[in-house]
Each structure stands twice: as structure tokens, then as C-alpha cells.
């Protein structure tokens, strides 16, 4: 996963994705921490990529 921190990211370029790191605990609500914007984003168990800052795909 390639994430690039750009300070406090609010928007990403149209062709980029918001990269989040999942620090959620089992049996609890997931907590996603915004890592930055990336043009190449791959999801894993602990990483999530979204097209918006609200993580609404």
C-alpha cells in the first residue's frame, strides 16, 4: 500500500484514492485513520481505500 501524507488531507485528486489504516478492534466499531492520498492503492486486512473522505465507495 502506498500512501502519501499531505498534512491534513481533505481532498484528493480525481484520479487518486483516500488511503485509510484500519485500527479497529474485533467486535468493536472499526476506526479508520486517514493516511493520505495515493494513485495506487491496494486494500488489505488493515488498509482501506476510498473514493471520498467519508469512505463512501
Swiss-Prot record:
Keywords for the protein's UniProt record, in alphabetical order: Disulfide bond, Ion channel impairing toxin, Pharmaceutical, Proton-gated sodium channel impairing toxin, Secreted, Toxin
Protein's organism: Dendroaspis angusticeps (Eastern green mamba)
Membrane keyword on record: no
Localization of this protein: Secreted
Keyword Secreted in annotation: yes
Protein's job: This three-finger toxin inhibits ASIC channels. It acts as a gating modifier toxin by decreasing the apparent proton sensitivity of activation and by slightly increasing the apparent proton sensitivity for inactivation. It binds more tightly to the closed state and to a much lesser extent the inactivated/desensitized state of ASIC1a. It interacts directly with the outside surface of the thumb domain of chicken ASIC1a (ASIC1a), but does not insert into the acidic pocket as suggested previously.
Pfam families linked: Toxin_cobra-type
Family label: Belongs to the three-finger toxin family. Short-chain subfamily. Mambalgin sub-subfamily.
Descriptive protein name: Mambalgin-3
Transmembrane segments: none
GO MF annotation list: ion channel regulator activity; toxin activity
Record GO cellular component, one term: extracellular region
InterPro entries, alphabetized: Snake_3FTx, Snake_toxin-like_sf, Toxin_cobra-type
Tissue localization of expression: Expressed by the venom gland.
Amino acid at each position: 500500500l502506498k500512501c502519501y501524507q499531505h498534512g491534513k488531507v481533505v481532498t484528493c485528486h480525481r484520479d487518486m484514492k483516500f488511503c485509510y489504516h484500519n485500527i479497529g478492534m474485533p467486535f468493536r466499531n472499526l476506526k479508520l485513520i486517514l493516511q493520505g492520498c495515493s494513485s495506487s492503492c491496494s486494500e488489505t486486512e488493515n488498509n482501506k481505500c476510498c473514493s471520498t473522505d467519508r469512505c463512501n465507495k
